């Protein structure tokens, strides 16, 4: 647990506003159920209520998603992030019923997660708005690739959700545009390697210093690109190892970063200011 504990402390010291164990960057797809819960438990213990912990508990099985979310709730997670079911490609009504079942079975705040390039299904704004009416479905991380989805979701919201339901970017390269349309921040890949810069970027925009946010966004764009030069989280794990933040390696079917991409990733992160 040494590397995980150290990464958490680094994030808290760098101004990160919340920790998301068992998201995509945490290799959630290749950890078994027990490992998922061990990582979530350890994260909650180390964070010790200093910042929120949003546990990744999504599954393409509704029963499994309910179980994981109930377990994370019992461990003390502040919220749970649930990706849309992947591979089985449910309809919009299927998505609604999936999240309704999870909401009905839990009390922990739920953050929806829409990432069509990885899951094969795209949760539409109208479906999000229907789900936002559940008291414990509090927000969405959207990585559909269309920043204007923020506007579509906000326009579709009704009742109390118009004020209470939040939207977060799941696409680092589009975070600035999404915040201009009303997103409240991001659940970020780049923050895993440049937490202080990403924190400053978001905080600058949200406090009204849009000029500073734009400068930082421009500075960070090469990093956003580099961290997806191969399947994420491969580049992220490689550069964290290079920076001495963790040991190298990644679980199959992903493989270590190709030699041909080392320089691009290293230069992008170093130029932007790794660890500063």
Predicted segments — roles?
Residues 4, 36, 40, 65, ...:
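A general structural signal for well-ordered alpha-helical segments in protein cores
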Residues 8, 14-16, 25, 180-183, ...:
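C-terminal alpha-helical cap/extension of soluble enzyme domains
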Residues 1-120, 128:
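Active-site beta->alpha loop and helix N-cap motifs at the rims of alpha/beta catalytic domains
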Residues 45-51, 75-76, 106-108, 133-136, ...:
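Short helix-capping segments at alpha-helix termini
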Residues 11, 43, 72, 102, ...:
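Conserved, mostly hydrophobic/aromatic
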Residues 104-105, 118-228:
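Catalytic alpha/beta core domains of metabolic enzymes, predominantly
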Residues 114, 136-137, 251-252:
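Glycine-rich phosphate-binding "P-loop"
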């Amino acid at each position: 647990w040494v590397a995980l504990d150290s990464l958490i402390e680094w994030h808290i010291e760098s101004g990160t506003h919340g920790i998301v164990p068992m998201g995509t960057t945490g290799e959630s797809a290749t950890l078994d159920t027990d490992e998922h819960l061990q990582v979530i438990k350890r994260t909650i213990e180390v964070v010790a209520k200093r910042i929120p912990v949003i546990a990744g508990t999504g599954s393409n099985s509704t029963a499994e998603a309910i179980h994981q979310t109930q377990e994370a709730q019992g461990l003390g997670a502040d919220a749970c992030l649930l990706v849309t079911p992947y591979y089985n490609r449910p309809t919009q009504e299927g998505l609604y019923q999936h999240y309704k079942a999870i909401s009905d079975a839990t009390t922990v705040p739920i953050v929806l997660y829409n990432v069509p390039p990885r899951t094969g299904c795209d949760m539409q704004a109208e479906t999000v708005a229907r789900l936002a009416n559940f008291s414990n479905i509090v927000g969405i991380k959207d990585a559909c690739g269309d920043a204007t989805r923020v506007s579509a979701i906000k326009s579709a919201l009704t009742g109390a959700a118009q004020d209470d339901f939040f939207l977060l970017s799941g696409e680092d390269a589009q975070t600035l545009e999404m915040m201009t349309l009303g997103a409240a921040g991001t659940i970020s890949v780049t923050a895993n390697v440049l937490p202080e810069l990403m924190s400053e970027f978001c905080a600058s925009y949200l406090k009204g210093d849009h000029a500073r946010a734009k400068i930082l966004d421009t500075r960070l764009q090469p990093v956003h690109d580099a961290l997806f030069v191969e399947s994420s989280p491969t580049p992220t794990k490689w550069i964290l190892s290079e920076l001495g933040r963790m040991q190298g390696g990644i679980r199959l079917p992903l493989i270590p970063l190709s030699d041909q991409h080392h320089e691009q990733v290293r230069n992008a992160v170093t130029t932007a200011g790794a660890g500063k």
